[in-house]
């Protein structure tokens, strides 16, 4: 009850007067629009057509034509931090999201939990009569909360959303996603062979959610937070969509930048004098070193296009084609939502906001990858091996990412990419369309704004004041400002004065058209922060940050540096953390349970996430499955952990017991029984005995399989050093509900065991082994 009871209560109801107002469902302000909040992932400034890009996005064009294109809107440079701003209207460090939620370090600025004093826009609107829906990527809860034993307080349904369908982590396989429906994991409705793709699936659910409520209360507005996995790696696209771009990127990434900058100038997106930043603005790793000689990160480098052999160019062209297909395909799915809103008479009264969470990603490094799990496991990508996948790139057979050259291209004209406080990391697409509320159509806006400014804009447009208390928590002030003033005033001066940036030790500050920025890579011992070299740019006229004016205006630079410290203190930006990923990974964190020697798993349960599943890396292990085989026989998956990009499985096929260990997707190690599995009760086992390590962290040994106590097969195998998956692909009993560990399973998805699995017991021996370097690579690729 949010309002006091104003009726009369006496002994007899006949002498009492009711008051229903405190007990009524909340009602939205009269005429409040629907809100469709679309968040692209890792889509740089120069990928989509409304921003001069060469990737076809007709739905984005449609929204730009019916609304406004903002050229000077900014993010934090990373996923969870930006999404926290988009949800609360507060800075990322105020939200406890200085980095991705998995990299929490136990301080107010970096703990992986948005405080309840910083309510989400969904929490605010639910209490004001909106239906609230979340589709797609969340990435706003700590890793130890992404499981069925955890509290759901930081899941979407715990932070104001009435319905949720998507995934909780940083990325997912688009063909076999880690699906959660409301508060429980579910399996996808069909297989890729039957036409499944995550972008289409969440669109189907989005339409279902809208129709469910509108059929009952058509006047009740909705707030929908729609966050596809596109275009974060893996870049998974239906082949026919990727093939639309055959030959379109043959010019290479450097020529792409030139073509797109010319288009951007023609479209009035950037000043006519905007220069194109160098392809390696920080220099090569050999050229750029710390004060004591440490080289700059080797992954943060672009190979000049004209130095590449033709075969390498061929691979990189196809990687761009697949990425473009992924983007266009998802744009098409978003178009289905826009079409429905128009057909049902709702589009004019829907505020549509489209953003990306950061710049294009350079995490593919100079060479890109066909299987990112290779990088996470320290296995070098081979051009010869990658070329074998050229024709199936983007299919379920690959887990791919383009090279960093395309990240620079899709961030044109800016320098660097995601994670950097240069504009390549933080200046990102923003479209706003609201036909009933914005008179201007198809115009460009250049006012400087930030992700924190969208929540106050939504509140302004819906006629709702920021609440002082939400769910009993007194609220911290919203830190952003409304952008509504700019809707019909193209020349209005920005009402934002200052914005601070901090990400993994790299810092920036913008104030009244000027920006100071310093690069500080996350390398242990790179330098003391006092040794950082600050640069100065007049970004009002130099959008690409090509002209460093630090030497020309030293006093202005010092003022901005001082302002950075003031703003960082104001928004709890300390401590700064420039440690390596390995050091961040080893920070002690709360755990759901302590590691143990024995794990017991049951069928007909939710998939166990990789982070909570038994760790068998570089150690001996034994799995024993208690099963019941009917007289007619049985087949299917008994136990599966991981996927075709790394994992192991125990299954029955053609009456025989089989064990497969898939080494990072490179090769399968299969051991089959010499005898058939009998009917009745049996124990089916696979026991690995570690005999050595070669190379380090790669265990070598003997794997034996047993039916009851009889050894029925044996062979030597090697186990991979890192996790089975970068994200998702956990542990299942009685089926394999995600990407299959092997293509040898009998039957069809999800390859269920047709007998009965009572339980599977996994015993592990020896010390828990974690290859910190590999774990760190995997963590950073998830951001």
Language-model-detected regions and their locations in the chain:
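Formylglycine-dependent sulfatase
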Residues: 1-530, 534-535, 539, 543-562, ...
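Short, intrinsically disordered/low-complexity patches at protein termini
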Residues: 94-95, 105-106, 285, 385, ...
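Hydrophobic alpha-helix feature that most strongly marks membrane-spanning transmembrane helices
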Residues: 463, 488, 541, 565, ...
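C-terminal, active-site-flanking charged/polar segments
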Residues: 519, 535-541, 553-570, 682-683, ...
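Extracellular glycan-associated modules
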Residues: 575-783
């Amino acid at each position: 009850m949010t309002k006091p009871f104003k009726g009369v209560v006496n002994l007899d109801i006949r002498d009492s007067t009711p008051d229903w107002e405190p007990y009524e469902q909340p009602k939205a302000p009269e005429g409040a629009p629907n809100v469709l909040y679309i968040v692209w992932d890792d889509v740089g400034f120069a990928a989509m057509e409304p921003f001069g890009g060469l990737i076809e996005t007709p739905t984005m064009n449609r929204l730009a034509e019916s609304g406004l294109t903002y050229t000077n809107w900014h993010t934090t440079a990373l996923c969870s931090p930006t999404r926290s701003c988009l949800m609360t209207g507060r800075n990322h460090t105020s939200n406890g999201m200085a980095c991705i939620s998995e990299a929490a370090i136990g301080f107010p600025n970096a703990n992986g939990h948005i405080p309840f004093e910083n309510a989400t826009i969904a929490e605010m609107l639910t209490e004001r009569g909106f239906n609230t829906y979340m589709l797609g990527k969340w990435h706003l809860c700590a890793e130890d909360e992404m499981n069925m034993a955890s509290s759901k307080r930081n899941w979407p349904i715990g932070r104001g959303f009435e319905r949720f369908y998507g995934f909780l982590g940083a990325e997912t396989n688009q063909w076999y996603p880690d699906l959660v429906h409301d508060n429980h994991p579910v399996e996808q409705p069909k297989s890729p062979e039957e036409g499944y793709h995550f972008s289409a699936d969440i669109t189907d659910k989005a339409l279902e959610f809208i129709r469910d409520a509108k059929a009952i209360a058509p006047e009740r507005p909705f707030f929908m937070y729609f966050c596809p996995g596109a275009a974060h790696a893996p870049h998974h696209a239906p082949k026919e969509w990727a093939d639309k771009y055959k030959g379109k990127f043959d010019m290479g990434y450097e020529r792409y930048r030139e073509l797109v900058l010319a288009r951007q100038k023609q479209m009035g997106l950037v000043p006519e004098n905007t220069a194109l930043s160098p392809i390696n603005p920080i220099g090569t790793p050999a050229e750029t070193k710390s004060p004591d000689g440490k080289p700059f990160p080797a992954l943060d480098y672009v190979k000049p296009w004209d130095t590449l052999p033709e075969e390498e160019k061929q691979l990189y062209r196809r990687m761009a084609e697949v990425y473009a297909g992924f983007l266009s395909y998802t744009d098409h799915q978003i178009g289905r939502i826009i079409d429905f809103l128009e057909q049902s008479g709702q589009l004019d009264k829907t505020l549509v906001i489209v953003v990306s969470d950061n710049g294009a990603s350079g995490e593919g490094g100079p060479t890109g990858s066909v299987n990112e799990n290779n990088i996470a496991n320290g296995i070098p990508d081979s051009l010869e091996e990658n070329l074998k996948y050229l024709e199936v790139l983007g299919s379920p057979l690959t887990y791919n990412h383009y090279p960093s050259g395309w990240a620079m291209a899709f961030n044109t004209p800016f320098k660097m990419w995601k994670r950097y406080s240069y504009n390549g990391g933080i200046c990102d697409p923003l479209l706003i369309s609201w036909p009933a509320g914005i008179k201007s159509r198809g115009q460009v806006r250049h006012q400087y704004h930030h992700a924190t400014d969208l929540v106050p804009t939504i509140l302004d447009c819906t006629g709702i004041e920021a609440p002082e208390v939400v769910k009993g928590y007194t609220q911290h002030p919203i830190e952003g400002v409304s952008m509504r003033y700019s809707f019909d005033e193209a020349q209005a001066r920005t009402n934002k004065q200052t914005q601070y940036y901090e990400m993994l030790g790299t810092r920036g500050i913008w104030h009244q058209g000027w920006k100071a920025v310093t690069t500080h890579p996350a390398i242990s011992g790179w330098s003391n922060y006092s040794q950082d070299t600050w640069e100065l740019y007049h970004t009002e006229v130099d959008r690409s940050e090509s002209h460093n004016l630090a030497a020309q205006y030293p006093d202005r630079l010092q003022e901005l540096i001082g302002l950075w410290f003031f703003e960082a203190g104001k928004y709890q930006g300390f401590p700064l953390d420039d440690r390596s990923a390995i050091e961040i990974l080893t920070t002690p964190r709360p755990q759901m349970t302590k590691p143990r020697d024995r794990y017991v798993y049951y069928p007909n349960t939710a998939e166990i996430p990789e982070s909570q599943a038994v760790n068998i890396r570089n150690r001996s292990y034994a799995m024993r499955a208690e099963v019941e085989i009917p007289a007619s026989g049985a087949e299917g998956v008994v136990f599966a952990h991981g996927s075709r990009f790394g994992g192991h499985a125990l299954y029955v096929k053609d009456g025989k017991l089989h064990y497969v260990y898939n080494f990072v997707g490179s090769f399968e190690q299969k051991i089959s029984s010499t005898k058939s599995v009998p009917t009745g009760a049996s124990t089916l086992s696979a026991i690995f005995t570690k005999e050595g390590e070669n190379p380090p962290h790669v265990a070598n040994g003997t794997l034996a399989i047993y039916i009851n106590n009889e050894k029925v097969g044996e062979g030597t195998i090697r186990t991979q050093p890192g996790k089975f998956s970068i994200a998702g692909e956990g542990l299942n009993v009685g089926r394999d509900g995600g990407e299959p560990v092997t293509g040898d399973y009998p039957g069809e998805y999800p390859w269920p065991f047709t007998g009965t699995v009572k339980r599977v017991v996994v015993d592990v021996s020896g010390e828990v082994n974690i290859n910190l370097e590999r774990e760190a690579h995997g963590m950073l690729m998830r951001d």
